[in-house]
Each structure stands twice: as C-alpha cells, then as structure tokens.
Amino acid sequence: MARFPEAEARLFNVKICMRCNARNPMKARVCRKCGYKGLRPKSKERKGR
C-alpha cells in the first residue's frame, strides 16, 4: 500500500477506538479521546475489495 516500509509502519502501527474512531498508539490500553477500552489494530487491507 505505502511506497516505503517507514511510511507503512507510520500508517498501520496504530490502534483504532471502536467507539469514536480515534487513532491511538499501539501500546495504548484506553482511547486518548474518550477513554474507551475497546481498541482494535488498524486494518492492513481495504474492506470489501
């Protein structure tokens, strides 16, 4: 997807909050924006294609 491994790491090494869709660091346990504990890793591939 990204041209460089560094760029890909920057884009995909995050967790997404299931409540507010905020981006959080991989080491996060709760969302930085709303405090929700339900975080998922960002998808590496597009959905439905």
UniProtKB/Swiss-Prot annotation:
The keyword Membrane does not apply. Belongs to the eukaryotic ribosomal protein eL40 family. One of its GO terms (biological process) is translation. HAMAP family: Ribosomal_eL40. It comes from Archaeoglobus fulgidus (strain ATCC 49558 / DSM 4304 / JCM 9628 / NBRC 100126 / VC-16). This is Large ribosomal subunit protein eL40. SUPFAM superfamilies: Zn-binding ribosomal proteins. Keywords: Ribonucleoprotein, Ribosomal protein. It comes from the Archaea. GO terms for cellular component: ribonucleoprotein complex; ribosome. Gene3D superfamilies: 4.10.1060.50. NCBIfam families: PRK04136.1 (NF003161). One of its GO terms (molecular function) is structural constituent of ribosome.
